[in-house]
Amino acid sequence: MANLISFHDVAKHKCKNDCWILIHGKVYDISTFMDEHPGGDNVLLAVTGKDASIDFEDVNHSKDAKELMKKYCIGDVDQSTVPVTQQYIPPWEKESTAAETTKEESGKKLLIYLIPLLILGVAFALRFYNNK
């Protein structure tokens, strides 16, 4: 059985000489890798104390990088200790959501102008037919 590590314990290790990160439920002790990371140690330090899965996927790491990660894995995070965060939404879904919102807003704007015009039209029609 894999070593279960609480999120609180992972969050404690957040300095260059003692750095753990959480990616896809796995805990990695990357203290010895800090100087080797192509993006620099600041990039890694920026994702300590949180689930770094989204940040990791955004970079689109190579297969070699993902293979190298196995060397630094020290266990699995206890999922019951991980704070709830926002769910990852791929960029293409974000655009779709924004487009739907824009369509809804434009429909509402159209109604704002059409309803008064419709009321005005009915009022003129009633007045015209009542005068005859």
Swiss-Prot record:
Where is heme annotated to bind?
A: H37, H61
Q: Keyword set for this entry?
A: Electron transport, Endoplasmic reticulum, Heme, Iron, Membrane, Metal-binding, Transmembrane, Transmembrane helix, Transport
Provide the protein's localization: Endoplasmic reticulum membrane
- What's a Pfam family in this record? Cyt-b5
According to its UniProt entry, what is the function of this protein?
A: Membrane bound hemoprotein which function as an electron carrier for several membrane bound oxygenases, including fatty acid desaturases.
- Bilayer topology: Single-pass membrane protein
- Quaternary structure per UniProt? Interacts with CER1, BI-1, FAH1 and FAH2.
Which InterPro entries does the UniProt record give? Cyt_B5-like_heme/steroid-bd, Cyt_B5-like_heme/steroid_sf, Cyt_B5_heme-BS, Cytochrome_b5
The record lists the membrane-crossing segments as 110-129
What GO molecular function annotation could you give as one example from this UniProt entry? Answer: metal ion binding
Q: Boundaries of each Cytochrome b5 heme-binding domain copy?
A: 2-78
Provide GO CC annotations from the record.
cytosol; endoplasmic reticulum membrane
Iron recorded as keyword: yes
Keyword set includes Cell membrane? no
The UniProt entry, under SMART domains, shows: Cyt-b5
Entry's family note? Belongs to the cytochrome b5 family.
What protein name applies here? Answer: Cytochrome B5 isoform C
Major location category of this protein: endoplasmic reticulum
**Alphabetical list of PROSITE patterns matching this protein:** CYTOCHROME_B5_1 (PS00191), CYTOCHROME_B5_2 (PS50255)
